[in-house]
Amino acid sequence: MAIKVSENGRLFTLQTKDSSYQMFADDKNVLLHLYYGEKIGEENLSGLIFCTDMGFAGNPEEAGPNRKYSLDTLPQEIPGSGVGDFRDDMIDIRHADGSFAADFRFDSFEILDHSYAIPGMPALYDTAVSYTHLRAHETAANL
C-alpha cells in the first residue's frame, strides 16, 4: 500500500491496488474524511467539503463569526464527544472530575514500515508481508 502525503503534511492519500482513501487536516486541525472508493490519483479532494450555515448546528469557538463551520456537519475521522458534534460519538470518555469532553485535533503524523502492536489488543505478525502504516497523532483536550 502506498501512502502519499502532501507537501504541507495535511493531506493523506492511501492507495491500494484498486482503491483510495483520503483524509485532510483542516485549518482548525480537525481530521476530515474526504474519500474512500475506486482508485484515484493524488488530487486534493478537500474542495468536496461543503460548509453552509445550518442554523441549528453549533460552532466551535475558534470558528469566530464563521457560522458555516460546524463539527456537527463535518465528516470527521475521529469525532469526539461533548464539543458540539451531536451525532454518535466514536468514543465516550468520563474523566476523574466527571467531565466527558473529548476534542480530538490533528497534531502530527509518522509513516511506519513495520507492523506494530497496541498492548492488550490483537495484532498480526508476518515476516513475509511488508507493512506500511500511517499513524496520525492527535491531541485531545482534557485527555
Where are these regions (language model features)?
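Acidic-aromatic substrate-binding/catalytic surfaces of carbohydrate-active enzymes
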Residues: 9-124
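Conserved small/polar residues in nucleotide/adenosyl-binding loops
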Residues: 132-139
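Acidic, proline/serine/threonine- and glycine-rich low-complexity intrinsically disordered segments
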Residues: 128-129
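Short, Gly/Pro- and small/polar-rich lid/capping loops
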Residues: 1-9
